[in-house]
Design a protein with these regions (language model features):
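N-terminal intrinsically disordered, cationic/polar leader segments
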Residues: 1-27, 35-99
Length: 99
């Protein structure tokens, strides 16, 4: 199962993704697509990136902060992961924490 943790603490945002969606390559590919798209966007934006960790073992963590652009990027990635969980809850678990 893929486990996703999303956190908004003021203007600081955390996106963490761990594990493979064993048994469903489509969910695994979709989760990877979402996290790598966000990482690419962050690299090309003016948003402050505190941490970027992406590895080949299905683990990723992005921590970033900023204003409206960072918030919009976070909202978009949350929507993507929550929609994925809605369609495939047996393969992906998403926790959204707003502090």
């Amino acid at each position: 199962m893929t486990r996703v943790y999303l956190e908004r603490a003021g203007n600081r945002f955390t996106v963490s993704c761990q594990g493979h969606a064993t048994g469903n390559q489509d969910v695994c590919a979709a989760a990877s697509c979402l996290i790598y798209t966000l990482a690419g966007w962050l690299r090309n934006s003016s948003v402050a990136v505190e941490k970027e960790h992406l590895d080949q073992d299905a683990n990723a963590k992005l921590i970033f902060s900023g204003g409206e652009n960072a918030e919009t990027a976070f909202d978009m990635i949350c929507t993507g992961f929550l929609q994925l969980e809605l369609t495939s809850p047996q393969y992906i678990s998403v926790i959204l924490n707003v502090i």
